[in-house]
Structures are given as structure tokens and as C-alpha cells.
Amino acid sequence: MTDMFRPGKNARRAVLLAVAALFTATIWGAQDKPGAPAPPPAATQPAEYVGSQACQMCHEDISNAFQKNPHHQVETGNTHGWATRACESCHGPGSKHADSASAADIRQPAKLKPADADKICLTCHLNQPTHVGRINSSHARNQVSCTACHSIHKNGPNGLVARKQADINKLCAGCHADVWASFQRPYKHRLPEGAMSCVDCHNPHGSFLPRSIQTVSANEPGCFKCHGDKVGPFTYEHAPMRLEGCTACHMPHGSSNPRMLTRSQVQFVCLECHSNLAVPAPAANASLGGVPPAFHDLRSPRYQNCTLCHQKVHGSYVDRGLLR
């Protein structure tokens, strides 16, 4: 007879199987029981500041370049409370990154959303005169962050990515290709040659004037930094100068027309406002009317070179007709 028919041995097996089943059911029941407390998560310690010297141990090349950058003043001074830990003023506390050497354990402004990256810069730069309009500027509205034009580590004028004035212009041209094309026309501001810069006329951080135009004083556009003789104040002003500005007659970047005019000849510019060609021929010495009024038969060639007589087209101190 085999062992399976031995009563004593079978009884022992049955008892062992019952105990094992009961133990297993107890464990699974405890896991499935509603409200059973989950094991507590491991405590996460926040990163701490370790100072720039810890950063230099691995990032020596960046540290050497940073010493020539205007932002290095944050490291050596205490203007904003970041002395000896300038790296962490932008990248945040670095203890975890120092331990793990993982990029995931440090803030990377270049990978943040533009608005979030700008907040870091504006912590220090918000109240500077050239930056007061940054939040509502056209660059900010179009998601162009500070780091698109500025380098935090490299050495350049005012921390710019570009080092030379001509390179700054090319930096702007990287986005404004249509404007750059205007500077290739025969009559232009000498910007491609490096004689002037985009920021001579535009404030890239924002302005109270359209197109981020620089202001000289009050609401006067930046044109008058160089062309001050055209602004007055005049006793007799030419209304478009005050109401529309220089671009009523001139192309600001470049033109195919002399003096960067919007039209091929001066009289065609004048006729945009002073046109009375729809009025019948007048009697001798009579005004043709029009809005604004004109006093000559402009269909006659003798009256089509306006600036032959009206020489002070921007404004005059002595003559209401802008003759002199």
C-alpha cells in the first residue's frame, strides 16, 4: 500500500496546507482592506545653496568666462544679496546637482518657458530705466526671452550674445529679415556698415511709442537724436511732423528713393495730402481749395517742384507758408 493511504501522514499534510492557506489569505486581505495605511513616502530634503566655488569645480570654463561678464558683479558684491553664490541666483540652490551631477537636479533657464525665464532676469533688472516696459513689450508678447539676445555667461557689451555693434545688428536681423532687406536699398541708414545700431532707434526692452521706438524726451522719437534741427519747436509747424512723425514722408530703414522718401519724387509725397487735382481749373490768383488747401494749379509743371519754394518742410520760425 502506498503512502497516500497512510492516515497519519495525510493528516499532517492537511494541517500544513491549511496553515499556509490561512497565512496567505491574511496577507492578501490586509493589502486589499480599505483604509489600510500606505507606507510613508521617503522624506525629500530641499536643495540648499552651496556657493559658486562648488560650481567652479566642474564648470571651470564657464566660470572663467563669467568673470569677464557684467553679471560677475553679483558674485563680488552684495547689491542683490547674492554675494559668493551668483550661479545660484539664476540656477537655484545647487546641493542636489552637486551630489548627483544630473541636469535634472538644477534649474536651467534656457529650457524654461520664455515668461518663466524672464522672471528670473527681472528679479534684478525690472526697475532699470531701459527695462520698465519689458513685461508688455512686443518681444515679451511674442515669447522672445531675454536669453535670446543676452548671454548670462559670455563676455560681450552689456552681456549681449553679440560682441560688436555690427554683430548686434545681425542678431536683430536673425528675426527681422524683412527689415534687414530694407538696408540693402540704395538710400539707407548706414547700419550694415556698423556706423549705427538697431538699438540707436529701437528699445528692445519696450517703449511707450509704437514699434519700440526710442524716445529722446517726452514722446519725441529717437530720430531727433541725430536730426535735432528738424524737431523745432517751430513758430510755424508742419502738421504731419507733430501728428504722424517722420515716417509720414520717410522710410526709416531704407528706400529706393533719394532722402529715403516714400515716393520717387518730393512732389508726389506732398500730393498725398495737398492734392486738388479733382477741382476745376481756377480763375487767376484764386485758391483751388482742397484739404489741406492748395493755392496753385498742380497740373502745371511749374508748380510741381514744391520744395523749390517751400524749403522749410519740417517747420519754420518766420514764415507761415514754410517758404524760409
Regions found by a protein language model. Give the residues of each.
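Sec-dependent N-terminal signal peptides
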Residues: 12-20
